């Protein structure tokens, strides 16, 4: 088997790999590969190296605020050069290497390094990166990033995409290059959602989403979830102003309601404001950063997961985020926005309720509806868990990863892949 070297520009709470990165690494280790993650510790506080159940994390220790795109852009080349030098050192000892680079911010380094040492490159595209930064940067810059990504795809031996819209977007770029549209349409995303599991096997492009390992959400804990007096709404994730997730607005909405509690976990620029709201209102609780290992139990022990997203951001509108699959796996309903692709799934499968973005009075009405109809919530939660067990679980993704790596081993030269 191979030495798989992953590269990622960030870590999560505790200086460890994000869940989807860790799950991918676990699956690769299970297949017999040795895994090293070269990651940027943007706090500069954690150990240089540490051992995990799936391999080793090597950290590039350089402080860089998560919400400072200009500083990030200035410091990114240093991380990419550091990663390349580490890989070159490993290559002196080990020739059977596969590079696995996460997201567009690392991909230029991946293409450069893979060409130098002539090894396969897997591009793990978690999101429409140009779509994500659009708004924070000019349209010209976002479009340039899109075309740059399309150019680099030809140098990748294998590609992993997350949600259906991103899969369709990348497929368009593989077919049309720089002439491909900036984002996939909703119709294209729906067509990907209709694809069967076998369609994602034995090809250069596969789909591995933010789905969860169901053994982290055991059935016995779901059946014996905590009983509470208050209706508990949960959000654990990114706490940034842009693109908005409606966290402040939800907190202010809930603050005026009786017998409702809004628990918020995570880190970001909204934290100072959330701490002020926490201090002012008894039923809004900022829990601080939550370790990924604790997310399943927190989710199981809530009544509903909130995942509101501003649909004016194209990445938001067409995404299939972590929160959706955490709620599914935990067997709890989800509240989201009806304009989102995720909202359409929630409505169609009847696993939660939706409201129009910005209509916080409608959010209040939905919360009231759920509070006083526990039977409805219970049925939504059961449907949600069944959907996770049937389709949206890590076991299927693991098979796709195995298939992609077999493809990559057979096709080490991207030009013939």
Per-range role (PLM):
Residues 7-12, 27-78, 166-171, 179, ...:
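N-terminal strand-loop element at the rim of the active site
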Residues 304-307, 326-336:
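Short hydrophobic beta-strand element within catalytic cores of glycosyltransferases
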Residues 6-23, 44-46, 240-245:
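A short, glycine/small-residue-rich beta-strand->loop->alpha-helix junction that serves as a flexible
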Residues 362-365, 369, 376-391, 400-403:
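A short, well-ordered alpha-helix in the C-terminal region of glycosyltransferases
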Residues 4, 210-212, 216, 225-245, ...:
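Conserved donor-binding/catalytic core segment of Leloir-type glycosyltransferases
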Residues 230, 258-260, 272-297, 301-304:
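Nucleotide-activated donor-binding/catalytic signature segment of Leloir-type glycosyltransferases, i.e.
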Residues 23-26, 84-91, 108, 112-116, ...:
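Membrane-proximal helix-turn-helix segments that form the acceptor-binding/catalytic region
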């Amino acid at each position: 088997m191979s030495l798989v070297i992953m590269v990622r520009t960030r870590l999560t709470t505790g200086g460890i790999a994000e869940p989807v990165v860790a799950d991918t690494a676990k699956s690769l280790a299970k297949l017999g590969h040795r895994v090293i993650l070269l990651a940027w510790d943007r706090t500069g506080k954690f150990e240089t190296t540490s051992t995990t159940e799936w391999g080793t994390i090597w950290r590039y220790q350089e402080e860089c605020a998560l919400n400072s795109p200009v500083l990030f852009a200035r410091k990114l080349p240093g991380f990419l050069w550091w990663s390349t030098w580490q890989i070159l050192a490993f290559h002196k000892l080990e020739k059977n290497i596969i590079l696995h680079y996460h997201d567009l911010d690392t991909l230029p380094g991946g293409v450069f390094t893979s060409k130098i040492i002539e090894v396969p490159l897997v591009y793990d595209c978690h999101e429409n990166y140009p779509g994500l930064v659009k708004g924070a940067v000019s349209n010209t810059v976002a479009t340039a990033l899109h075309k740059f990504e399309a150019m680099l795809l030809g140098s990748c031996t294998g590609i992993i995409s997350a949600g259906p819209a991103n899969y369709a977007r990348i497929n368009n770029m593989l077919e049309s290059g720089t002439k491909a549209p900036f984002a996939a349409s909703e119709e294209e995303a729906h067509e990907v959602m209709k694809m069967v599991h076998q369609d994602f096997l034995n090809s250069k492009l596969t789909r591995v989403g933010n789905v969860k390992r169901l053994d982290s959400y055991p059935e016995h804990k779901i059946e014996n979830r905590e009983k509470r007096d208050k209706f508990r709404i949960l959000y654990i994730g990114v706490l940034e102003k842009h693109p908005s997730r409606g966290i402040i607005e939800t907190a202010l909405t809930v603050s005026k309601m009786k017998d409702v509690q809004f628990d918020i976990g995570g880190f970001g620029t909204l934290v100072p404001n959330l701490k002020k709201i926490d201090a002012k209102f008894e039923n809004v609780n900022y829990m601080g950063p939550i370790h990924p290992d604790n997310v399943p139990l927190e989710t199981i022990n809530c009544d509903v997961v909130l995942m509101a997203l501003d649909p004016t951001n194209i990445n938001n509108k067409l995404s299939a985020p972590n929160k959706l699959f955490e709620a599914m796996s935990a067997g709890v309903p989800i509240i989201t926005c009806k304009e989102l692709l995720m909202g359409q799934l929630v409505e169609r499968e009847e696993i939660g309720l939706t409201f129009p973005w910005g209509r916080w009075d409608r959010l209040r009405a939905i919360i009231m509806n759920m509070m006083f109809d526990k039977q409805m919530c219970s049925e939504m939660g059961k449907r949600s868990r069944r959907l996770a067990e049937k389709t949206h679980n890590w076991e299927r993704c693991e098979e796709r990863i195995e298939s992609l790596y077999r493809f990559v081993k057979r096709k080490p030269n991207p030009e013939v892949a």
